[in-house]
């Protein structure tokens, strides 16, 4: 088993300027998305590098605004009601994938209107580039020691002791005394072994989904299909990994005694993705390749 290193949140300090790991991960995510989108544009007659620059700008804006607003609405709504200014306290952290996803969709919709494309022409073009952002984001979560997984006694070598979870571990120990045999002391704090669910998500929602989507979209597919595969891939991955991820402290299990907020938000993505995929192939409209209607 491993002990989380408790990395310094500052990745690089240049005099008074401090670059935090999480900010660096966002920078890498946007830079990688731009590079991949630029490459894809070189393979498409109806996309230019200027359009890619605009697209990434709209996407970045959607991620940041949507991610923050979504986090506050989905996970901290009570705090927002009591203190509306909490929405602006971005320095305290808090981003939601599902909120960022909605923000990106809105950004892509505005982009599509500007360049007279359909929304799904834009979505299908950019979705293969999105999982790399999820990959870097989850690595950032791991470095920060946040969004850790559930306690496990499985004895797996990769289980991790997160000192950041010490206070929560003590609460779990009080309600489950049988966990006593698993506890160890780290820097004066008593912690339990947990699944490094951030890395599970980085691997499944990030690396694996990127590889599959990149391959899938490298050949002509009907309009809407790539977007549908993304929804299915992310939704299924997130739904499964939520069984290993510790539910948010202030949320817990919100449905049926086992379903988390992440699963509740991912289920509609799975359903929508399946419906869209069936519809896309049934309709059979192609935007490039021999079957495209120019």
From Swiss-Prot:
Cell inner membrane keyword on record: yes
InterPro entries: Lgt (IPR001640)
Stretches that traverse the bilayer: 10-30, 55-75, 91-111, 119-139, 196-216, 224-244, 258-278
Main location: membrane
Pathways per UniProt: Protein modification; lipoprotein biosynthesis (diacylglyceryl transfer)
Protein topology in the membrane: Multi-pass membrane protein
An MF annotation (GO) of this entry: phosphatidylglycerol-prolipoprotein diacylglyceryl transferase activity
Alphabetical UniProt keywords: Cell inner membrane, Cell membrane, Membrane, Transferase, Transmembrane, Transmembrane helix
A biological process term (GO) from this entry: lipoprotein biosynthetic process
Localization terms from the record: Cell inner membrane
NCBIfam families attached to this UniProt entry: lgt (TIGR00544)
HAMAP family linked: Lgt
Protein name: Phosphatidylglycerol--prolipoprotein diacylglyceryl transferase
Species assigned in the record: Psychrobacter arcticus (strain DSM 17307 / VKM B-2377 / 273-4)
Gene label: lgt
